[in-house]
């Protein structure tokens, strides 16, 4: 039950990831063999629930890629359910301050360190109580990544970084750029300056900085600055653009849509 993703971050080894939004265990397994260090199962913006997260965790399990799960909100009940089906690494969205970061950490810990309910007899995480001393070992293997996506969160970053149990801080470029008045343009110089400053600040505090960016040049820049978990693409985008390119080679034209951030 060792969390190798958490161990890699602690050791300072950069981890390259891919975002999963297709909500499919079949495509999750396909991508688990592609060579990425981690795969993000998105419960915030993709149509996932606990059951679909479970099947994707099962599909990814035989492969080296490590799953990271994003719940729809910083909700202790939802987090409890995700942990029970086997999630060890969480990316908690829209964390605004230290209190909210502390709540996220407490939701992943059994008492007295936290508030996670004990249901190990029903839980895949404990292999239905077949893992010896699961209740004693589980807390140490939880990896909590909090997501900062607003100017308010950026202002509170020093206090968030002081929260014990926060392993990493993920910068959400799409929401941050929108909050800064540059919706759809995370490459705006002011947004980029804020992102770069945050990456350096997070790393200097001994935490792991993370981000999602499909621009290869920017991804490499963030890695140079010290980012440790960087998602470099999204499965839905890869599929859509590849399909459009194939159709275009035979004279077809995709339905006109406004380009997205990723």
From Swiss-Prot:
Residues annotated as binding substrate: 147, 174-175
EC number per UniProt: 4.1.2.52
Domain of life: Bacteria
Catalytic activity: 4-hydroxy-2-oxoheptanedioate = succinate semialdehyde + pyruvate
GO biological process terms, semicolon-separated: 4-hydroxyphenylacetate catabolic process; phenylacetate catabolic process
Binding note for cofactor: Binds 1 divalent metal cation per subunit.
Site (Transition state stabilizer): 70
Pathway: Aromatic compound metabolism; 4-hydroxyphenylacetate degradation; pyruvate and succinate semialdehyde from 4-hydroxyphenylacetate: step 7/7
InterPro entries: Aldolase/citrate-lyase_domain (IPR005000), HKHD_aldolase_ent (IPR023701), HpaI (IPR012689), HpcH-HpaI_aldolase (IPR050251), Pyrv/PenolPyrv_kinase-like_dom (IPR015813), Pyrv_kinase-like_dom_sf (IPR040442)
Residues the UniProt record annotates as site (Increases basicity of active site His): 84
Positions with a binding annotation for a divalent metal cation: 149, 175
One GO CC annotation: cytoplasm
The entry's keywords: Aromatic hydrocarbons catabolism, Lyase, Metal-binding
Gene Ontology MF, one: metal ion binding
Active-site residues, record numbering mapped to chain: 45 (proton acceptor)
Cofactor: a divalent metal cation
Protein family per UniProt: Belongs to the HpcH/HpaI aldolase family.
NCBIfam families in UniProt: HpaI
Entry function: Catalyzes the reversible retro-aldol cleavage of 4-hydroxy-2-ketoheptane-1,7-dioate (HKHD) to pyruvate and succinic semialdehyde.
Assembly: Homohexamer; trimer of dimers.
Xref: PANTHER family: 2-KETO-3-DEOXY-L-RHAMNONATE ALDOLASE (PTHR30502), PHOSPHOENOLPYRUVATE CARBOXYLASE FAMILY PROTEIN (PTHR30502:SF0)
Name of the protein in question: 4-hydroxy-2-oxo-heptane-1,7-dioate aldolase
Species this chain originates from: Escherichia coli O9:H4 (strain HS)
């Amino acid at each position: 039950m060792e969390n190798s993703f958490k161990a890699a971050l602690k050791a300072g080894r950069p981890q390259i990831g891919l975002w999963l939004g297709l909500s499919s265990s079949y495509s999750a397994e396909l991508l688990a063999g592609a060579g990425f260090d981690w795969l993000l199962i998105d419960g915030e913006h993709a149509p996932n629930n606990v059951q679909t997260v479970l099947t994707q965790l099962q599909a990814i399990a035989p492969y080296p890629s490590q799953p990271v799960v994003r719940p729809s909100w910083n909700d202790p009940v939802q987090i409890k359910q995700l942990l029970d089906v086997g999630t060890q690494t969480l990316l908690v969205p829209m964390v605004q301050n230290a209190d909210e970061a502390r709540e996220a950490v407490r939701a992943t810990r059994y008492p007295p360190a936290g508030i996670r309910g004990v249901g190990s007899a029903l839980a895949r995480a404990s292999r239905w109580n077949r893992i010896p001393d699961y209740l004693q070992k589980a807390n140490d293997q939880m990896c909590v990544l909090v997501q900062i996506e607003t100017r308010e969160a950026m202002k509170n970053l020093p206090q968030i970084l002081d929260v014990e149990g926060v392993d990493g801080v993920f910068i959400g470029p799409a929401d941050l750029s929108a909050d800064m008045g540059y919706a759809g343009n995370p490459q705006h110089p002011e947004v980029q300056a804020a992102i770069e400053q945050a990456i350096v600040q997070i790393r200097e505090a001994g935490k792991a900085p993370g981000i999602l960016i499909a621009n290869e040049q920017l991804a490499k820049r963030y890695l140079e600055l010290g980012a440790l978990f960087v998602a470099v693409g999204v499965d839905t985008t890869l599929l859509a653009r590849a399909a459009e390119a194939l159709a275009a080679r035979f004279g077809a034209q995709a339905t006109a849509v406004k380009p997205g951030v990723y």
